[in-house]
Amino acid sequence: MTNSKGRSITDKTSGGPSNGGGFVDWTLRLNTIQSDKFLNLLLSMVPVIYQKNQEDRHKKANGIWQDGLSTAVQTFSNRSEQHMEYHSFSEQSFHANNGHASSSCSQKYDDYANYNYCDGRETSETTAMLQDEDVSSDGDEDAIVEVTPKLPKESSGIMALQILVPFLLAGFGTVSAGMVLDIVQHWEVFRKVTEVFILVPALLGLKGNLEMTLASRLSTAVNIGKMDSPIEKWNLIIGNLALKQVQATVVGFLAAVAAIILGWIPEGKYYLDHSILLCSSSVATAFIASLLQGIIMVGVIVGSKKTGINPDNVATPIAASFGDLITLAILAWISQGLYSCLETYYYISPLVGVFFLALTPIWIIIAAKHPATRTVLHSGWEPVITAMVISSIGGLILDTTVSDPNLVGIVVYTPVINGIGGNLVAIQASRISTYLHLHSIPGELPDEPKGCYYPFRTFFGPGVNNKSAQVLLLLVIPGHLIFLYTIHLMKSGHTSLTIIFIVVYLFAAVLQVFTLLWIADWMVHHFWRKGKDPDSFSIPYLTALGDLLGTALLALSFHFLWLIGDRDGDVGD
């Protein structure tokens, strides 16, 4: 075979007997094909994912990662060796069967979390989402360099403006959820089956476990160019939506089990019909709400990409904008409907639960067919389930607090403080994750000061992540003031807006977000150093901690206000 540069390659394939049983000599001449295009075609058939050597790490010049060679030029044979080393696929199967043999990447990647993006071969999410490739020719040799995508530079003002609108939208969504919860707390199912209150933070926390994780992961994929191809984009979307339905169903069921146990421990009473109602309500709510929010989230990500807006700034807050309201409304409606059927149509409640649980194998099959989500079906449950348990503890605090008639005013503010804190910390975690994907490799941190992650390091410094932490913290007080007065103008809640109430509430909100941003700085870098994708691991923990911190600080605030005499005025009644 002769290419356009005069190189001759003859491919001899042994075949059956022909003219006396010799070999068949296949010689192809491709004089019309340019060598660099032909090489580009070959390389595009096999995605390249590889790890830098120790001495090659962090060598970067003008946005181009160097491979540690004396020149930027690599021959095709050298590149093939890298393919063989890091993909370990069968060459015979690849050529003879016109497909990829089942294989895995280097063992070094086995601990990297969750997803693989390389045509069905097992890899990690973090490694697969590294640099895109750029193939060029110097006119004499075929040179291959890898170009690192860069985020557009953002000033603090531009960043604040991009965050402000979705932040306010998300805030009004949580305010609406708080007002709905303030109303439905008087419904019969909430009064007779108080364990439903334990479900509230756990199910609302699904937006942190699933929706915000999906938003952050797809935002990172957009920023590093992994959604430029339509096929790759829809593989990511369909696989992630199917996976999310599996997780929502399982987490919804486990949240109900946790609510049953946590509700049984204080009083020692157990009711089978209440347990079935909790399981059915939780599973149905998680499934329906997750599906609706997932579709909305995909639209936001794709729309952000087309309009040139950084999805890291808008995707996670919009993921939560109506998430709380949708989830809470569905939970209240389904649980009240099933409760009204307990005496006359007792079989409806278990049938509802069984129906949604029976759909789980279908979603598992769909998710397993997409390489981007196959691995997480086995290894991605730890953060989701742990976050659910943390949120359920916050629900127990809420259930205990609302049992006191003097502290019922906490209900309307719980979704607000929890939602705002979770939204802001999810934005920061998503931005740090994108920064790490663009400036370092999994398991290695970029050139930053070593040592403990103390608050001064998080909020003060020249880095872009320091700047975003400052902007997010500054949004807390004006944002909460807007939401407090919105609740007041809507005549909702059971608490008068006194000066001391506003001061105590804002102190709790600022302390919550300050703590979460500090923890996020450490946690995202920690998971990256461990080779785990922070988009999938950190956000569930952070939003769950936001629920726990928000509920606990709010409960302490209301206890403090009661002790000093600033008590409820039954405004909402």
UniProtKB/Swiss-Prot annotation:
UniProt record, GO biological process: cobalt ion transport; iron ion transport; magnesium ion transport; manganese ion transport; nickel cation transport
Pfam family, one: MgtE
Matching InterPro entries: SLC41_membr_dom, SLC41_membr_dom_sf, SLC41A1-3
Protein keywords: Cell membrane, Ion transport, Magnesium, Membrane, Phosphoprotein, Repeat, Transmembrane, Transmembrane helix, Transport
Location in the cell: Cell membrane
Molecular function via GO: inorganic cation transmembrane transporter activity; monoatomic cation transmembrane transporter activity
CC annotations in GO: plasma membrane
Lineage: superkingdom: Eukaryota
Stretches assigned to the Cytoplasmic side: 184-195, 267-282, 335-347, 398-406, 491-498, 565-573
Catalytic activity: Mg(2+)(in) = Mg(2+)(out); Mn(2+)(in) = Mn(2+)(out); Co(2+)(in) = Co(2+)(out); Ni(2+)(in) = Ni(2+)(out)
Ranges in the topological domain labelled Extracellular: 1-162, 217-245, 304-313, 369-376, 428-469, 520-543
Bilayer-spanning residue ranges: 163-183, 196-216, 246-266, 283-303, 314-334, 348-368, 377-397, 407-427, 470-490, 499-519, 544-564
Residue numbers bearing the Phosphoserine modification: 136-137
Protein family (similarity comment): Belongs to the SLC41A transporter family.
Function in brief: Acts as a plasma-membrane magnesium transporter. Can also mediate the transport of other divalent metal cations in an order of Ba(2+) > Ni(2+) > Co(2+) > Fe(2+) > Mn(2+).
Protein's name in the database: Solute carrier family 41 member 2
Organism: Macaca fascicularis
Gene: SLC41A2
